[in-house]
């Protein structure tokens, strides 16, 4: 039996072909075990820091429309400002009309008639057919080439599932899950008919890494991950690219974090990373149609997934401890505030 490792300067002196094959096999497994993490490290670094994403014009030329849910604050607002700067007309959907009007006025003041803006105020928690019918009428005849599924809701504070208020639980499911499905089902048929389009759904580490005391929110984001990946496979043959965008903390009203850091970007930093890495997996190595585009989030996602496992006991315990601590601090603050009144 030929020694297949001789070209690499490794010679196995064994008359028995079985022994030679076994030793060769063990050596190859050892080499592969060493090479796999090295290759994975190179891939994640290239994806996060070197390789560009797909151009937005791949999915629709400037002058077509982008529909953004949860558009009046935080990440959604930043998507609106960024896409307007790139030449896309906007359909802004959120709960509060006054905030939508203010954002629309800011964009119109900056870009004038070059960027058209339409708004729709609706409360996704109510799941009203009339609201979705209004959305359908609003987008009728428009070339909506980009959909940003951004609207979302978390718990007011970390809470055990058995103590979660029924209304909070229902609102999370309606906003995070049902609203995303219904909006996407309204918008994507037009993309399919035009054979191009982009759907970005904002997910969360809570959907990848089980998060005790945010169980309903964590489950809703896990649902979005599975749904988005399945939808992406369905729509890919029709020229529509669907990507689930993973993130850790961002300075938004939902996170209640105001100060940025290496691990916590502001909305502009996060949106810039997202739009510059479309089609790149970032830290979500090996997860189809998914990206963790912000550099520190990507490195964190990759490290935890590769070396600990998304659903490992260690990750779940650490998550539980962190959110138990957040809950204690939130309850103490509520007590102090109550005494002041």
Swiss-Prot record:
Transmembrane spans: 22-42
Annotated localization: Endoplasmic reticulum membrane
List of catalytic residues: 217, 221
Keywords: Endoplasmic reticulum, Fatty acid biosynthesis, Fatty acid metabolism, Lipid biosynthesis, Lipid metabolism, Membrane, NADP, Oxidoreductase, Transmembrane, Transmembrane helix
Record's keyword annotation contains Plastid: no
Coiled coil: none
Family annotation (Gene3D superfamilies): NAD(P)-binding Rossmann-like Domain
Biochemical pathway: Lipid metabolism; fatty acid biosynthesis
GO MF: ketoreductase activity; very-long-chain 3-oxoacyl-CoA reductase activity
GO BP terms: fatty acid elongation
GO terms for cellular component: endoplasmic reticulum membrane
SUPFAM superfamilies: NAD(P)-binding Rossmann-fold domains
Positions bound to NADP(+): 67, 123, 131, 150, 217, 221, 250, 252
HAMAP family xrefs: 3_ketoreductase (MF_03107)
Stated family: Belongs to the short-chain dehydrogenases/reductases (SDR) family.
Name used for this protein in its record: Very-long-chain 3-oxoacyl-CoA reductase
């Amino acid at each position: 039996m030929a020694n297949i490792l001789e070209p690499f300067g490794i010679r196995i002196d064994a008359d028995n072909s079985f022994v030679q094959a076994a030793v060769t096999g063990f050596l190859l497994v050892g080499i592969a075990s060493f090479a796999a993490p090295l290759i994975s490290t190179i891939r994640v670094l290239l994806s996060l820091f070197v390789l560009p994403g797909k151009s937005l014009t791949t999915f629709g030329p400037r002058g077509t429309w982008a529909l953004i849910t949860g558009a009046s604050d935080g990440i959604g607002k930043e998507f609106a400002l960024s896409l307007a700067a790139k030449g896309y007309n906007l359909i802004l959907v959120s709960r509060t009309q006054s905030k939508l009007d203010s954002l629309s006025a800011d964009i119109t003041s900056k870009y004038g008639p070059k960027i058209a803006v339409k708004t729709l105020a609706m409360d996704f928690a109510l799941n009203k057919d009339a609201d979705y019918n209004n959305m359908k009428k609003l987008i009728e005849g428009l070339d909506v080439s980009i959909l940003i599924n951004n609207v979302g809701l978390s718990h007011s504070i970390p809470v055990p599932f058995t103590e979660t208020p029924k209304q909070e639980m229902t609102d999370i499911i309606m906003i995070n899950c049902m609203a995303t499905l219904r909006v996407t089902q309204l918008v994507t048929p037009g993309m399919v008919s035009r054979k191009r389009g982009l759907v970005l759904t904002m997910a969360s580490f809570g959907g990848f890494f089980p998060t005790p005391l945010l169980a309903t929110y964590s489950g809703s984001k896990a649902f979005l991950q599975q749904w988005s990946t399945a939808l992406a496979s369905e729509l890919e043959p029709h020229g529509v690219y669907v990507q689930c965008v993973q993130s850790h903390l961002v300075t938004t009203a939902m996170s209640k974090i105001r100060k940025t850091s290496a691990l916590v970007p502001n909305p502009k930093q996060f949106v810039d990373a997202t739009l510059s890495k479309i089609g790149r997996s970032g830290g979500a190595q090996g997860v189809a149609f998914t990206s963790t585009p912000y550099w520190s989030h990507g490195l964190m996602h990759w490290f935890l997934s590769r070396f600990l496992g998304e659903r490992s006991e260690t990750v779940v315990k650490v998550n539980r401890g962190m959110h138990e601590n957040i809950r204690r601090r939130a309850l103490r603050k509520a007590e102090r505030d109550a005494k002041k009144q």
